[in-house]
Amino acid sequence: GYGARSRDVIKAIIATDKYDVKLLSQRWGATPFGFCENHPEFKNLLDLVVPMPLAQQPDIWAQITVPNEFQAVGRYNIGFTAGMETTLVDGTWVEGMNRLDINFVSSEHSKKSFLNSVYEKQDKQGNVLEQSIQITKPMEVLFEGANLEKYFAKKVNPNLQLNLSLDSIKESFAYLSVGHWMQGQI
């Protein structure tokens, strides 16, 4: 989810050793805090958390969340979002993406969904205005993949042939569902 993605992005930025990184903690729904305290490899991130309000405007502001929550706070503003598993996104998401200088999404499908989302802008009387709502800011795909060294068994049957190509799927339409079944009221 967004928490794991945030930690991955932060670790990668810190690893460049080019920036003075500061973090703001952001609540996500009813998700509990405490991940960093319970995972020693991330405990160092707690030292980077700064209190609100910010003492000064950041040079670079990066926000990792759903686009309707994007706010331009820094001199240069970057958005990271997974997007939506659909063909069109809501107009408020398009407007959120346009508030920032550049946005990163996690798949070509997500990027296409944003680019295909074009809406007529109307005034309060319902009159169509000349201006439309559509993505006007740069958007790039920041691929998130699986580490095959970690997620495939170390000992593979040499007679087993793994076909990792989606081109081999014979059906003209296929739906992939990935989820985690959990008990309610967690």
Predicted regions and their residues:
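Hydrophobic alpha-helical packing residues
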Residues: I13-I14, F114
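Donor nucleotide-sugar binding/catalytic pocket of nucleotide-sugar-dependent glycosyltransferases
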Residues: D101-L162
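Conserved catalytic-core segment of nucleotide-activated headgroup transferases in glycan assembly
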Residues: R5-R7, A15, D20, L148-I186
